Amino acid sequence: VESLGMICAEDEIGVGTSHDGIIVLPEDAPVGQPAAEYYHLESDWLIEIDITANRADALGHWGVARDLYAWLKQNGYETSLHRPSCDEFVVDNEDLPIDVEIENTEACKRYACVSITDCEVKESPKWLQDKLNIIGLRPINNIVDITNYIMMAYGQPLHCFDADMVTGHKIVVRTQPEGTKFITLDGEEHTLGEHDLSICNAEEPMCIAGIFGGKGSGTYETTKDVVLESAYFHPTWIRKSARRHGLSTDASYRFERGVDPNGQIYALKQAAILCKQLAGGKISMQIKDVYPEPMQDFPVRLNYEYAHRLIGKEIGAETIKNIATSLEMKIVKEDAEGIDLLVPAYRVDVQRPCDVVEDILRIYGYNNVEIPTQLKSSLTVQGDEDKAYHSQNLVAEQLVGEGFMEILNNSLSKTSYYTDLELNKYPLENVVKVMNPLSADLGVMRQTMLFGGLESVARNINHKSQNLKFFEVGNTYLYNKEKWSEESPIKAYSQEAHMSL
């Protein structure tokens, strides 16, 4: 029998998220009508942008728009940069005031919150679900979806608490005693310590700050009152804590790279406005904003001659100034040699003159810098390291000629290799430990190349490879506490070059 169609579930053709069964159309559905037209689907463009690790400011649609605006201005397009106003943010009552105390001001530079009462937690409207679905986020409920929407729009992570969990009507930002047990939203138990920042009520922690919420403190269908959080946490604290607990979320991804320290209030107001519109809530307190030491813009002195030399082309002072101002850098002083700039605090990657030049060249266009007719170079003289590298290559080529294959393993290794073996000549006390391990399996630097080589052998055997002959060139690392001293603690650490077969 010839088949002119196919049976589909909702998620297979993009009209829903259900995969429970096939779509059954009513009898009056017009035969031959395009499915997109029948389901009132609108076409849209999804642009995937690779953001480099240093561009934390671009981890949101607003940040990308800022860059696009600067490029359009540079290329002669008449355009403007604007975002929704906060005029609709109006405090309805003072029924649910929340106090805030920051005990650890190093880890938490700013913390703001607002309470919303009489909310109806329910499914988000279709337009909001569509916007989240198209960027790969799963809709949960209207309150949680609003926080995710604001995060993706402006790059500021938010968190929402059930107000009933905020006992004492007070939020305290602090670390916990070593060994404190905490269960996250996914039901996993974690052990907190003095290096883990947490958001607490008057009695207990409710959330691992900037990373993961606690079980029972989230927003559910029975929730009526919520507290919205908008904060700035120190990137290093969040990064180390996330690695320590093996947690990675959209929020931690942004916090550990550095969010805009002056964008918390705008994001909080926009979220509160949406809560009123989509959940019928009432704003029940003035925004509580604790910001002990406001973070300042970065002062940078940029000389025109330096910029032209680094770019490799004289693009002119006016072009430099126009691009700098379009990137929201303020010119505070100008003379014949250059300009004094204030770089926005959200540009954590632009703190030196060379960083400013890189930003200017990026907007000006690398392709607009012509290749010069003369290229400058410097003479180099081979030293002992070059000779050693040459000798290493000769040996490697000889081994390859004999049928060996070169492997390259990670210098990071499992801690268990130095603790679980009964007859281990590489004691744990001599390993170089990593302060912020990428994972639980990569917690120390290797003392020997043996374990990495055996891993490669095992992996290849499991893939049915035969006649395995490997060699590897690399370093091993050793810690000798007997050589440690306060005057020169680095003497306790050493590395050696090895070739293993």
Where in this protein do the model-derived segments appear?
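Conserved phosphate/anionic-ligand binding catalytic regions in large, soluble enzymes, centered on
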Residues: 1, 53-73, 136-161, 203-225, ...
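Conserved mixed alpha/beta core segments that line enzyme active sites in large multi-domain catalysts
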Residues: 32, 129, 134, 147-218
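Residues forming anionic-ligand binding surfaces in small-molecule and nucleic-acid pockets
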Residues: 32-52, 95-134, 235-255, 293, ...
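Terminal amphipathic helices with adjacent charged low-complexity linkers/tails
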Residues: 68-103, 279-307, 314
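Extended beta-strand-rich architecture
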Residues: 124, 144, 266, 270-274, ...
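Short, glycine-/Ser/Thr-/acidic-enriched flexible segments
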Residues: 1, 12-14, 52-56, 66, ...
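Glycine-rich, small/acidic residue-mixed loop/short-helix segments
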Residues: 216-269
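Phosphate-backbone binding interfaces of nucleic-acid-interacting proteins
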Residues: 1-90, 227, 250, 258-261, ...
